[in-house]
């Protein structure tokens, strides 16, 4: 009874702290919003005193920051740092037409060739392109790009099927895979993380480097399988008992982190004379961490089962779940939809998420075990069919999640969790692991291709300062949130440092905000360079974790046994949560 009472008191204290923090943040948020609205009203009142000829010009500038404000000083500094010619180095997706930009496609000029009816061709040429039809006329148009690649639009009247090869995609994939392998080998021989080698290799061969791969849309599409299989493997290793211990901080704590970043950025922008909407977007932008990169490091260091690893993974999963809500918020911030419409859109996304997870839960209890047993019986001699079925199941759930307006990442993780509830989770992981490693390397190399080394070198001073500021702020905010939920200093700092980068999904969020004209070009370039540089410095940040833990022990911030707990190889965590998990496992074994 006394233990239950202590747990209840501890939960009450955590709840009171959380409510107090939310009330304070909400108060400052509405205060800054009211302050910004009052400033806009004062500006409008000044405009009405002007003559009629200058009213239109004043209204156009009323939404801009106040003169001589801190935000105006920052704008002038950014205009000097990122002139207009930098737009050519890092193209803005918002400069394309809306249909192309929304689909994240590449706009390219091509020539459409429609031959004449009386044009004569050789027999071999007709046979290769299947040009022989009933009328003897070629009615299939061709497209020729700037590099003389020929694309057949359609071939409805061909007599015989011909395999059409995309040699451009094959050559690009060969370059990316070979360069990623060389980069990984070089960094492995130097005793450094291979992830850094993948990122650096991609930046060298990409458009910002030697330009071996100039058009990245096809490579990026194939590389997206890396994120899908990474999260699928993570779902296969999912443990409900371990996540149950950290769910109190992973779910409300993750939401609190996003809310805090949005509030702090919005308040800072308002007090400095900037736009409140830009500040809120920057907060949402900074709250996203790199799921693929962090998971890769945690897997390499065997830290998934650690306490800080479980909290980190839970927070990353929650961020993936919140992606749809953030996309619904962007039109509201950009002024393209009303507040009521934005709230309804977010409520719709939340309802779809709950219904989708509920349907998957029912399938995981009924259909999935039967399906896996069937595949096992059919794959008694070889695992080929079982491996193919596991991959197909992952892709199907991820595709359904994407079609419902959720994310591919959420669907692939949910597919892994569905299989983790069965007895074949470990067998499935062994079958999928080689595929995961291959596509993960391809994905990280494609992320490296987004990094323009020339652009980073020209603005390394301001971008490095921005990255250091992001690392410090994210580490402090995340550590405070974790500490509020009753965890020790060591766990809070480790979670903060693990999430102290900007995720690769922020590129998509940034592109969508640029299409909605939510941010200006100079801020777009600053955030783009900061995100790229933060991904490059993430391996170094993980290398510094043991040194930070050792320093914390010397300064008596952490317990003396923290340095042994953070050995990263076969890491165990010595906490009340770990003891509860071990007792639960021992009890289940004893009962069996």
Swiss-Prot record:
Membrane topology value: Multi-pass membrane protein
Pfam families linked to this entry: Na_H_Exchanger (PF00999)
GO molecular function, one term: potassium:proton antiporter activity
Variation of activity with pH: Optimum pH is 5.8.
Tissue specificity field: Expressed in roots, stems, leaves, flowers and silique.
Gene3D superfamilies: 1.20.1530.20
PANTHER family registered for this protein in UniProt: POTASSIUM/PROTON ANTIPORTER-RELATED (PTHR16254), TRANSMEMBRANE AND COILED-COIL DOMAIN-CONTAINING PROTEIN 3 (PTHR16254:SF14)
Name listed for the protein in its UniProt record: K(+) efflux antiporter 4
Protein's gene: KEA4
